[in-house]
Regions:
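C-terminal substrate-binding/catalytic lobe of Rossmann-fold NAD(P)-dependent oxidoreductases
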Residues: 169-180, 213-314, 356-416, 423-424, ...
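NAD(P)+-binding Rossmann beta1-loop-alpha1 motif at the extreme N-terminus of oxidoreductases
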Residues: 2-73, 96-99, 136-140, 452
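C-terminal amphipathic alpha-helical interaction region
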Residues: 412-413, 417-478
Length: 478
């Protein structure tokens, strides 16, 4: 980077929605000056109002905004993923100088980030994509951030992001992830893990309500208690809070009034699609995506409930207090499996795309600020610290201990739910993945024989090199 000129604002933010505005306020709180741009005058006014007394300034004119940034300029975009990112970049290029830095802080698809990085580098601009997790509160008080791409560009603003990030043991929850689109890839997988954990918690809620017939206060107390122990996590914490939040209009639980149709922005789907492209199984994440899709078919589900008598669900036991031991084990088992699948995908992507990911450092920056932060991330960090070449968390000794100690609980819960007609597909996917993973010989030999039978796709033999084909039965017609 060249020597900076003495201009007013150190960093610029394009897009002053909740995330962009809160990040700028966070930046100002840590002693850095910032400028914000948005076409919406109300959002600019809001920034100026909230930033009163801070070294912040909002602009509705992009030319004036650009002129008021230090050089070389550092600009972050926080706009919706897709075409709008390309449109903003196209608007910026004529106004910037070579050597300026553009940062995409949104949830862009990593393939798009790779394309943009290559194109901007060719014309002399620095660019990197940075995944940001923590929601609006994290943006304001300290998010977890995953920057990947132009390393020299990141170094120029590294001190800013380290200052504004969440801290765990006084260590910043941000680190340079790797080259290319690695930052956005890691954020995508983070979101896939998030989908799966949310689905597991929803299924836990289903078991507690329909399977154990507990009231809302009891369910709240269980999640609150879990959050004080080894299952502590941000998502468990907010679930406990949700289960005590009353509707101001009716004075009963707001959760009971919310429609059971879950929306999404697509990052979970992207994770599943990429994993399939890499031939790597992440079934807990996959089923979490599918269940959100199924939730949208409310009218069909209502018709089916009338035909098939709906879900009775239980009671699974006459001793719910004792049964909670099984459920806690089941959640622990499935949570570990979810993280293991996500980390395995990162391992595979690192090899495939030459990202050179340091999985211990990724686990480290996920310990604070982000949506999937949990006590278990300390175990993940330790596992990859002990063995940087660890391919799968199931091979780590401490993780093995958790899985073995939780196995009875997950088997009991999945079996009982199936018996009583409770849908807990993420729990079931966790158990089935584990059982298949530990199978030295799977029944896939039959699939290969079938493929060769109807399509002459060939097969391989144990102890012999090469591929083979058989004329299985010339009398069978397909």
């Amino acid at each position: 980077m060249s020597k900076k000129e003495n201009k007013k604002y150190r960093i610029g933010m394009i897009g002053l929605g909740t995330m962009g505005c809160n990040l700028l306020l966070n930046i100002a709180d840590h002693g850095f000056s910032g400028a914000g741009y948005d076409k919406n005058a109300d959002k600019v006014s809001m920034l100026d109002q909230l930033g009163r007394g801070k070294n912040l300034k909002g602009f509705t004119d992009i030319n004036t905004f650009i002129k008021n940034l230090e050089s070389p300029r550092a600009l972050m975009m926080l706009v919706p993923a897709g075409k709008i990112v390309d449109d903003v970049i196209a608007d910026l290029i004529p106004l910037l100088d070579k050597g300026d830095i553009i940062i995409d802080g949104g949830n862009s698809h990593f393939i798009d980030t790779e394309r943009r990085s290559t194109a901007l580098e060719k014309i002399g601009f620095h660019f990197f994509g940075m995944g940001i997790s923590g929601g609006e509160e994290g943006a304001r008080t300290g998010p977890s951030m995953m920057p990947g791409g132009d390393k020299e560009a990141y170094k120029d603003v590294q001190h800013i992001f380290e200052a504004i990030s969440a801290k765990v043991n006084d260590e910043p929850c941000v680190t340079y992830i790797g080259p290319g689109a690695s930052g956005h890839f890691v954020k995508m997988v983070h979101n896939g893990i998030e989908y799966a954990l949310m689905q597991l918690i929803a299924e836990t809620y289903e078991i507690l309500k329909k399977g154990l017939r507990l009231d809302n206060d009891a369910v709240h107390n269980i999640f609150d208690q879990w959050n004080k122990g080894r299952l502590q996590s941000f998502l468990i914490e907010i679930t406990a809070e949700i289960l005590s939040f009353k509707n101001a209009d009716t004075d009963h639980l707001l959760l009971d009034d919310i429609r059971d149709e879950a929306k999404s922005k697509g990052t979970g789907k992207w994770t599943s699609q990429v994993a399939m492209d890499l031939n790597l199984p992440i079934p807990v994440i996959d089923i979490a995506v599918s269940m959100r899709d199924l939730s949208k078919y409310k009218s069909l589900r209502t018709k089916a409930a009338n035909i098939y008598d709906g879900v009775q669900g239980g009671p699974l036991t006459e001793k719910p207090d004792e049964y909670l031991i099984n459920l806690e084990q089941a959640y622990s088992f499935s949570m570990v499996t979810t993280y293991a699948q996500g980390m395995h995908l990162l391992y595979k992507a690192s090899e495939t795309y030459n990202y050179n990911l340091e999985l211990d450092q990724i686990a480290k920056i996920w310990r604070g600020g982000c949506i999937i932060r949990s006590t278990f991330l300390e175990d993940i960090y330790s596992a990859f610290q002990a063995n940087e070449k660890l391919e799968h968390l199931f091979l780590d000794r401490s993780v093995q201990s958790i899985l073995k100690n939780s196995l009875q609980g997950i088997r009991t819960v999945v079996a009982d739910a199936a018996t009583y007609g409770l849908a807990i597909p993420a729990y079931a996917a966790s158990l089935n993945y584990f059982d298949a993973f530990r199978s030295e010989r799977m029944p896939s030999n039959l699939i290969q024989a079938q493929r060769d039978f109807f399509g002459a796709h060939t097969y391989e033999l144990i102890g012999k090199d090469g591929v083979f084909h058989s004329e299985w039965n010339s009398n069978v017609k397909t």
